[in-house]
Amino acid sequence: MSKTHLTEQKFSDFALHPQVIEALETKGFHNCTPIQALALPFTLSGRDVAGQAQTGTGKTMAFLTSTFHHLLSHPAPEGRQTNQPRALILAPTRELAVQIHADAEPLAQITGLKLGLAYGGDGYDKQLKVLENGVDVLIGTTGRLIDYAKQNHVNLGAIQVVVLDEADRMFDLGFIKDIRWLFRRMPAANQRLNMLFSATLSFRVRELAFENMNNAEYVEVEPDQKTGHRIKEELFYPSNEEKMRLLQTLIEEEWPDRTIIFANTKHRCEDVWGHLAADGHRVGLLTGDVAQKKRLRILDDFTKGDVDILVATDVAARGLHIPAVTHVFNYDLPDDREDYVHRIGRTGRAGANGHSISLACEEYALNLPAIEEYIGHSITVSRYNSDALMTDLPPPKRLTRNRSGNGPRRGGNNNRRSSASRSPNRKRSG
């Protein structure tokens, strides 16, 4: 992996708790990323931080390192009860909460601090059983946390650290009232360490967030470069009739190792999945109504390489740490210009190079001016030869719900086309 995204600043240069240093070095973390190097001097001195950095720059480890150091360096409140966690990390989605929990486990193993996880969808009793034994760091989504708090399974009166991750999405999804409800049940802002991290922070979000922070320091990485320097951006203008064939031709030509294809609706994602599955690709489907256990399984298959292509709505665009994604396709240009940044941020992570390809079709081309205004540059336009598009394509598979026995499963196809089936003659014109 490329190290060019790291700074000369080492974690060991900071006055971090020795167990935190041990946990970081055990996982191979020695040098800080820019956002970590900027944030840690403040958080380690007890100052609140609002951090903005593009996706994949180490925001999660910045706040986890700060959280564990703070808890190890400060005693628990006197009289703390079993149902009172010491730190609360709020995430907008179940998938992100699960990922943060996984990233925190190495720190927990070394330090002995206990983790809890609380998210909706399933696992209610399993999550509750862990909480009943007492946890130090509770990671979760607002709805399930409020549920537990109202039933007194969780009491927030001993919170010493609170983190809002992907804060802009928290507010965009309408969680403002939930967040305020939770904050009202914590100690005052000046009695805890507060951190807020996100790839994009609007003025509205900062104002709302700062209501619950204590004179926070604002730190940012590359504020004028909203898309990563290592991401090659490319744009095509297909007709609606040629759009699917262009996508399949580009996949055939690029033959990417690990790809995410974004579309704007569940039904469009299902259509793309059906065409690619029928064409022999190992493809997974991730939309909002996929059951939680299946979502986690699909993400695990994609991460392990058992699935090569993930077709997704924006549910997968925020916060998921999927390594080595080589390509992102915007089959539809997003309606929200900020989602463009989050989508293509799935590639080019941790110093690697990435490739983003967007299709500006007749339906969504009107979204392009707002996107280019937001990212501060025009996306390079490429041309293609209609006569060179693939034509020998099978009819798409149709998604069968509530199906048992044989047949295509929702969310996956296990047969990747062999390299021998690729056509060497299908090329796009420059």
Curated annotation (Swiss-Prot):
Position of sequence motif Q motif: 9-37
HAMAP family listed in its UniProt record: DEAD_helicase_RhlB
Primary gene name: rhlB
Domain Helicase C-terminal: residue ranges: 245-390
UniProt record, GO biological process: RNA catabolic process
Enzymatic class: hydrolase
Residues that bind ATP: 53-60
Region feature Disordered, mapped onto this chain: 388-430
GO MF terms held by the record: ATP binding; ATP hydrolysis activity; RNA binding; RNA helicase activity
Name recorded for this polypeptide: ATP-dependent RNA helicase RhlB
Keyword ATP-binding annotated: yes
Disulfide pattern: none
GO cellular component assignments: cytosol
Motif mapping: DEAD box: 165-168
Assembly and interaction partners: Component of the RNA degradosome, which is a multiprotein complex involved in RNA processing and mRNA degradation.
SMART domains in alphabetical order: DEXDc, HELICc
Low complexity composition bias: residue spans: 402-423
Catalysed reactions listed for this entry: ATP + H2O = ADP + phosphate + H(+)
Function as written in the Swiss-Prot or TrEMBL entry: DEAD-box RNA helicase involved in RNA degradation. Has RNA-dependent ATPase activity and unwinds double-stranded RNA.
Keyword Nucleotide-binding on entry: yes
Top-rank lineage group of the source organism: Bacteria
EC number in record: 3.6.4.13
Localization: Cytoplasm
Occurrences of domain Helicase ATP-binding (ranges): 40-219
Entry keyword set: ATP-binding, Cytoplasm, Helicase, Hydrolase, Nucleotide-binding, RNA-binding
Family in the record: Belongs to the DEAD box helicase family. RhlB subfamily.
